[in-house]
Amino acid sequence: MNAQVLNLVAALGVMQYSKKLDFTDPQIVYYARAAYVISNTIIFGVYAIIQARINANNDETPLVYEEPAPPFSGQSNGKLVTTTVKEYDSEQLQKAKRSTMMGVAIMAFMHLYMGYAQPLVIQSILPLISLFTNNLVSIYIFNKAAEGSLSRPFAPPAGLFGGGNKPAAAVTGTSSNSNNASAKSDGPTITELNENETEKSS
């Protein structure tokens, strides 16, 4: 099932369930807080495991790809990025951590300052669903091969009805530390494309 659809269905279900809870009851609020803390403990625990496995694999396989231009930037050409599998995965993990910490900060403001308790229940479930549909979790926790929909660079999250274009990727070189977490080439390398363009122009 599409991750966005799964999140939507889960959100609607949890919202309907949370409406039946009496958040004026201190014990209900206590359990909601406990669930939220446990949920985020699991999330950051999984992040720590992934970081350890990224460092252990130390996959220095070169990864070259074109990063799409930001929406509404007026730029037609993307940015050429040269990195390694290890650096790319570490960067993606840091983005996930920042997103989670931002969510915790917003939730803390809503609950501690504004007094809302119902969102604690929702935010105990949805981030866990997002976590276990994350590409890095699929590769480093579930040991799935980094190919197909899991090939690097990762495609942007699809909308409710699919879609989401993936930037063209080229992986060159090999690494002795590469394993199932290594990226796989989806086509000709950037160098090969440039050589073809040079031959045509000459």
Curated annotation (Swiss-Prot):
Chain positions with Phosphoserine modification: 185, 201
Bilayer disposition of the protein: Multi-pass membrane protein
Keywords, ordered alphabetically: Endoplasmic reticulum, Membrane, Phosphoprotein, Transmembrane, Transmembrane helix
Source taxon at top rank: Eukaryota
Biased composition (Low complexity): 168-185
Positions of the UniProt region annotated as Disordered: 165-202
Gene Ontology annotations of biological process type: protein insertion into ER membrane; protein targeting to ER
Subcellular location(s) per record: Endoplasmic reticulum membrane
Transmembrane segments: 34-54, 102-122, 125-145
Claim: Amino-acid biosynthesis is one of the keywords in the record: no
GO cellular component, one term: endoplasmic reticulum
Family from the record: Belongs to the PHO88 family.
Protein's recorded name: Uncharacterized protein C589.06c
